[in-house]
Regions:
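Non-catalytic C-terminal accessory region of glycerolipid acyltransferases
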Residues: 2-5, 9, 94-237
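Catalytic core of membrane glycerolipid acyltransferases/transacylases, capturing the structured
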Residues: 6, 31-90, 98
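Short, basic, glycine/proline-bearing loop/turn elements
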Residues: 10-13, 80-86, 113-117
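A short, well-structured juxtamembrane/interface segment
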Residues: 12-35
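Short, well-ordered coil/turn elements that cap or connect secondary structure elements
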Residues: 17-19, 57, 75, 136, ...
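A conditional alpha-helix N-cap/helix-loop micro-motif detector
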Residues: 20, 89-93
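A secondary-structure boundary/capping signal
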Residues: 26, 41, 64-65, 82, ...
Length: 237
C-alpha cells in the first residue's frame, strides 16, 4: 500500500510541476509480467524516485547505495519505495542474492549499469554487474533513456527547475552467455551492450562514451538477442 501511494504521489507531483514539459515514451514496450531487468542511465538524484513511478508495474524493486540506509527514517522510506541496499563497486553478495530472488519470483529489478550518478550527464563506462545479472538470470533487459533530469534537479539544488524531462522505454532484449561461434560473452561486454541500447534512446550529446553506436554494435555483435512479441501493455502508468 505504501509503495502504491508513493508511486502515485511521485507521478502526480511530476505531472503537475512539469505540466507541458514531461513525457513518457514507449511504455508499450514494458513487459507487464515476468522477470525483468530495467536499466536506465543515471545523471541526477531525481532518477531513482522517478523511474519506478512511471514503470507500469507494481512489482518493481530498485538497488540503492548502502549509504542511504544508515539513518532509520531514510531507511524506512527507501524500503517503503521498494529499494534495497547495495555496496557500490563491489561484489555485494547479499544484494546479488536479493536480485536473483526477485527475478526468480517473476518481479522486476531496476538497476543503473553505471553504478553511480554520472555528474557530467553523459554515458560512462558501466560496472560489470548489470551484465552479470542479465546473463545469469537469463531474463529480458529493458533499456531506459532519461533526458532532462540533470537539468531539472542539478547537484546541490534545493528545488527542481521547470525544464523538459522525458523517460523513453526501449524494446526489451536478452543478453547472451555465448556468441553464435561459441565464444563466451564477458560480463563487461554484456554491460556495454546494455549501455549501447540505452545510448540509442538518448540524444547524441548525452551518449558520451557510447556516441559511436554503430561501432559499438559491430564490436558487440551476438551479445544480445531480440525478443519476439514481448508481453507488453497498452496503458500508461
Amino acid at each position: 500500500m505504501m509503495y502504491a501511494f508513493l508511486r502515485a504521489l511521485m507521478r502526480t507531483i511530476t505531472r503537475v510541476y512539469l505540466a507541458g514539459l514531461f513525457e513518457v515514451v514507449g511504455v508499450e514496450n514494458v513487459p507487464l509480467t515476468g522477470p525483468l531487468i530495467i536499466c536506465p542511465n543515471h545523471s541526477a538524484t531525481l532518477d531513482p524516485p522517478m523511474v519506478p513511478a512511471f514503470v507500469p508495474r507494481s512489482d518493481t524493486w530498485s538497488m540503492a547505495k548502502s549509504e542511504y540506509f544508515r539513518r532509520p527514517l531514510v531507511r524506512f522510506f527507501f524500503y517503503a519505495y521498494h529499494a534495497f541496499p547495495v555496496v557500490r563497486h563491489s561484489a555485494d553478495r547479499a544484494a546479488l542474492r536479493r536480485s536473483f530472488d526477485l527475478l526468480k519470483s517473476g518481479q522486476a529489478l531496476i538497476m543503473y549499469p553505471e553504478g553511480t550518478r554520472i555528474e557530467s550527464g553523459v554515458l560512462a563506462k558501466p560496472e560489470p554487474g548489470a551484465g552479470f545479472i542479465a546473463q545469469k538470470a537469463a531474463c529480458p533487459v529493458l533499456p531506459v533513456g532519461l533526458t532532462g533530469t540533470r537539468e531539472c534537479l542539478p547537484k546541490g539544488a534545493r528545488w527542481p527547475r521547470r525544464t523538459r524531462v522525458s523517460i523513453t522505454f526501449g524494446k526489451p532484449f536478452l543478453v547472451q552467455q555465448k556468441r553464435a561461434d561459441g565464444t563466451r560473452v564477458s560480463h563487461e561486454d554484456a554491460s556495454d551492450a546494455i549501455m549501447v541500447a540505452i545510448a540509442e534512446l538518448l540524444p547524441l550529446e548525452q551518449r558520451g562514451l557510447f556516441s559511436e553506436v554503430e561501432l559499438h554494435r559491430k564490436r558487440l555483435t551476438g551479445v544480445t538477442a531480440p525478443i519476439a512479441d514481448p508481453p507488453a501493455g497498452e496503458g500508461r502508468a
